[in-house]
Amino acid sequence: MSTGSAGAAEAVSACPVSGLKLARAFWTQMGKPMIAAKYPQYAGRIAAGLVGHGSECYGFDDAYSQDHDFGPRFCLWLTDEDYAAIGEQLEVDYEALPRKFSVDAQGRVTFEAHARSDASGAFPSAGAGSPVTPRAQGANRRDGVFRIGDFFESITGYRTAPAQTAPHEWLMLQESTLAAATNGEVFADPTGLFSKTRQGFKNMPDDVRLALISKRLGMIAQAGQYNLPRSLKRGDGAAAWLSIHEFVQATASLVFLVNVPMVVGYMPYYKWQFAALRKLSGSMFALLPNVGEQLETVMRLSSAACYGGAGFGEGGKGAAPAIEKINDIVEQIAVDIVKELKREHLTTSGETFLEWQRPYVEDHIASDDPVLKSL
């Protein structure tokens, strides 16, 4: 972004409420009354909410999120039959909704049609929102009117979730893709059809979950317990750095899988991966609650460990202290993972080199489908 555009962005006051709160107010004050007035016979059939791509759908948006693709918006989800009857006109009416709003000192959002005569202390009118980027337009639009099947297909490639008996299809779906299809909030769903479809994507078959846990155990062992220390001994900082990346990704994913995505959600894409991991770790019911903080320590030390050299750091101690600390954390994480696998009766082995835990976990996979087993 150029200096000029950055200055312009900073000159606009940030909206003090989250995107989800703004979306719910927009639906309640503007969208729902419009549907009741113009489409009364369909009011009991249209689902509304905010799900999909965008920081606000994960609940992690902040002032920095508001310089693009931010503003009052929600989604309306229709059956194929209802979309054929009213979809195009409903989209026109949705786009015509007034989007100017104010936010008072208590955080209450008021849209223009509901503005009070006494506006003292209110947040200044925020207009229609920030500029919309090309990635959120056309076929990639993130709000408005959708067929239910089209909406999920645009995110996952599937109109409905793969069958519970189709593990190969589940394994082709990235966790971040499933996170985008199941995040956000549903404000209204009179028929329950949208929520049922969404729930299908939340309901990862347990055999698939166990297969993914096994895969993550393999990568944690390969990248963190094997290749990382060897790369550091060789002095290959680039290889060590990439090993840390693979180790962190696999370990973070394993934490979400162990906690069961149906309960805690899927791990989102890299930008919000650690925001979600911190939120999960802060839950009183979280499993492996300390792993996220341990991973952040590994990442903080990685520069010194991978590129510190012999004379780096306080007193010229070099990279050795950082390397030792990282290796200790990797092994402690492995110990904690084995304890959790034992607690869940997924293993009877105390072996902490996690590659050797994979057969024990895979013994609990009920299906004989070879895609679920390691080679």
Residue locations for each model-derived region?
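Catalytic or ion-translocation cores adjacent to nucleophile or general acid/base/metal-coordination motifs
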Residues: 23, 27, 44-47, 54, ...
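Conserved nucleotidyltransferase catalytic core and NTase-mimicking acidic/glycine-rich helix/loop elements
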Residues: 170-374
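Hydrophobic, Leu/Ile/Phe/Ala-enriched alpha-helical segments that form helix-helix packing faces
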Residues: 27-39, 90-98, 337, 341
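Intrinsically disordered, low-complexity Ser/Thr/Pro/Gly-rich regulatory segments
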Residues: 2-7, 12, 60, 76, ...
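Helical scaffold of the NTase/Pol beta-like nucleotidyltransferase catalytic core
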Residues: 2-50
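Conserved NTP/Mg2+-binding pocket subregion across the NTase superfamily
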Residues: 84-233
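Active-site nucleotide-donor binding segment shared across nucleotidyl transfer reactions
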Residues: 34-81
